[in-house]
């Protein structure tokens, strides 16, 4: 991994801080829309620190610099940060959070500055409280982003890619129905308007897809929805005639992206109140808890704003019948591509003894996926990792500088694709030679956790927080664990990481119960730093299941797995599996064989590999 000398960049940033009387400057990862994955023009934290992981926050003082990130990226950050940076390993004992570290640095009446478009109102409030408790002066919102000024002309331009309509056969629900349901929520909340800032929520609401952020079919935009209007703020040059006509037919007004804050000021000053569709007078605005501090301030702050878990996000997370059918279908096609890839890779490495590096292998997988029906692109950077690289949880192989795949070591491939009918995310760990007993033990424990969660049945109202331990239990018995969540929501031809649901130990996963129609990943793992990494990831849908009893008159839920890729027989230790686990595995493999074999009628190499990997234990 490349390590960048950040000395000059930090020096220039500190000059700008001094000019503005700022002693501590916070640089979050997110863009103005709280996006997890961002466009190149918004990669400010990466530019200033050299750390390219998707999660983290940089904090710079006049003489120090710190980068905070979670356990997924400890290994990567330690390799990418230069001598100017302190790594704050979030979640470890006695390690301060970035907010705590920022507050500590503000002691003695110092000023903390931030771009208010890049943090939420709640984070701003908490940080302000911490700063003042530590003896700092205040948290100050700055009109200019100081990293942008350092970046100057080298900063990439904002993308202007075309926006297209997603046909209703894929979306399953028309725009007018979605707007009607959202307005009913405005009524229930007695809100004057909902200002929408999350890009995937806007794409879902209007059944549109774009290409402004790599791997995420979204576009830079805001939306304001009232009881009688819907306005989309977007660069109009991205809209073709068909998309313009479609929006007009759905009574959606289009205005320039850059004037959204002007429109908010006009809306605030136009009336002191308005009538909701139920006739109730309302003065308050509704925004998502993920909306920016700048947006909240422009709407009048706490006195005029209700911050809520987005009703659009809640609706989007519950897939309709068309979306669920699409997820099933695209995972079969995607599974076929992965099966062909793994058969090809084994043949190249073992039979033909070809030397392939990690990127060359990933390129082949992308080529195979691109042949599938309704393929659009990848859903994230493919993690193609051999040996010790597999222990880097979010490893990204670099073209021309990555490792040659070692057929005698573990190979981990975490990859996904965007299709018009759904989004995929699959991880498989393979070994093309003779794995060690330790590797087989770890793999089988991870597999047992995957099966335990896949087969779980739980009452309605259960959260992902409550069932996370099912995936970890077998590792825990051996004193092992992993430093990442067990599952995340998955969008329908949208972001591969989708809230508000998930499975993990974070408090946020205790806030929203799992519901039929939710689509999540199930991905336990184990990582031996410097040696190997193991992860097994499937995508599954929450469905209602029939039980003999119904305690508390509650329906009971379970999972339907949609990923159709075999597990690595070479890494399974059968003696560690129960009879029930073996039966589940055999049935699942038979299902995979039945649903994918039709793709390989003229491909004996792949068919032979598939038959071998799916034969009963």
From Swiss-Prot:
Bound cofactor: record note: Binds 2 manganese ions per subunit.
Entry EC number(s): 3.4.11.9
Keywords associated with the record: Aminopeptidase, Hydrolase, Manganese, Metal-binding, Metalloprotease, Protease
Gene name of the record: AMPP
Annotated binding of Mn(2+) 1, by residue: 425, 523, 537
UniProt key word Amino-acid biosynthesis: no
Keyword Protease attributed: yes
Entries under CDD domains matching the protein: APP
Name of this chain's protein: Probable Xaa-Pro aminopeptidase P
């Amino acid at each position: 991994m490349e390590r960048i000398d950040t000395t000059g960049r930090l020096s220039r940033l500190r000059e700008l801080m001094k000019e503005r009387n700022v002693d501590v400057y916070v640089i979050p990862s997110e863009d103005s829309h709280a996006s997890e994955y961002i466009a190149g023009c918004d990669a400010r934290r990466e530019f200033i620190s050299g750390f390219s992981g998707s999660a983290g926050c940089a904090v710079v003082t006049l003489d120090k610099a710190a980068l905070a990130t979670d356990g997924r990226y400890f290994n990567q950050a330690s390799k990418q940060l230069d001598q100017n940076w302190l790594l704050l390993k979030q979640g470890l004992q006695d390690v301060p959070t970035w907010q705590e570290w920022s507050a500590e640095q503000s002691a003695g009446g110092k000023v903390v500055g931030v771009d208010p478009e890049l943090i939420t109102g709640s984070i701003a409030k908490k940080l302000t409280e911490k700063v003042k408790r530590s003896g700092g002066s205040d948290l100050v919102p700055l009109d200019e982003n100081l990293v942008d000024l350092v970046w100057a002309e080298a900063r990439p331009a904002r993308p202007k890619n075309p926006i297209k309509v997603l046909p209703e056969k894929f979306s399953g629900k028309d725009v007018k129905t979605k707007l009607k349901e959202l307005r009913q929520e405005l009524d229930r909340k007695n809100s004057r308007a909902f200002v929408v800032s999350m890009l995937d929520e806007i794409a879902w609401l209007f059944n549109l897809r774009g290409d402004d952020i790599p791997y995420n079919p979204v576009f830079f935009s805001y939306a304001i929805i009232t009881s009688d209007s819907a306005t989309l703020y977007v660069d109009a040059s991205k809209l073709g005639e068909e998309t313009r006509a479609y929006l007009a037919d759905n009574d959606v007004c289009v205005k320039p992206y850059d004037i959204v804050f002007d429109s908010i000021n006009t809306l605030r000053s136009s009336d002191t109140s308005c009538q909701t569709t139920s006739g109730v007078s309302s003065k308050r605005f509704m925004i998502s808890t993920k909306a920016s501090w700048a947006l909240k301030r422009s709407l009048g702050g706490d006195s005029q704003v209700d911050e809520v878990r987005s009703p659009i996000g809640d609706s989007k997370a519950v897939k309709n019948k068309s979306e669920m059918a699409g997820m099933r279908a695209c995972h079969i096609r995607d599974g076929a591509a992965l099966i062909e890839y793994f058969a090809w890779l084994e043949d190249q490495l073992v039979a033909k003894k070809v030397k392939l590096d990690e990127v060359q292998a990933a390129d082949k997988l992308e080529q195979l996926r691109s042949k599938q029906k309704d393929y659009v692109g990848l859903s994230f950077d493919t993690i193609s990792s051999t040996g010790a690289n597999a222990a880097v949880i979010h490893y990204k192989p670099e073209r021309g500088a990555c490792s040659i795949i070692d057929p005698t070591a573990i190979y981990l491939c975490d990859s996904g694709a965007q299709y018009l009918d759904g989004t995929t995310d699959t991880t498989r760990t393979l070994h093309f030679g003779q794995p060690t007993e330790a590797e087989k033990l770890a793999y089988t424990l991870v597999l047992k956790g995957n099966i335990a969660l896949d087969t779980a049945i739980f009452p309605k109202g259960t959260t992902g927080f409550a069932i996370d331990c099912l995936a970890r239990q077998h590792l825990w018995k051996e004193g092992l664990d992993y430093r990442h969540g067990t599952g995340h929501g998955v969008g329908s031809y949208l972001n591969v990481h989708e809230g508000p649901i998930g499975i993990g130990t974070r408090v946020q996963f205790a806030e929203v119960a799992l519901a039929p129609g939710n689509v999540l990943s199930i991905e336990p793992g184990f990582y031996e730093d410097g040696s190997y990494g193991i992860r097994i990831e499937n995508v599954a849908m929450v469905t209602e299941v029939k039980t003999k009893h119904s305690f508390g008159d509650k329906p009971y839920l379970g999972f339907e797995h949609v990923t159709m890729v075999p597990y690595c027989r070479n890494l399974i230790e059968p003696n560690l599996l129960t009879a029930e686990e073996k039966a589940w595995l055999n049935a699942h493999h038979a299902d995979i064989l039945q649903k994918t074999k039709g793709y390989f009628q003229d491909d004996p190499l792949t068919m032979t590999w598939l038959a071998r990997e799916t034969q009963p234990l």
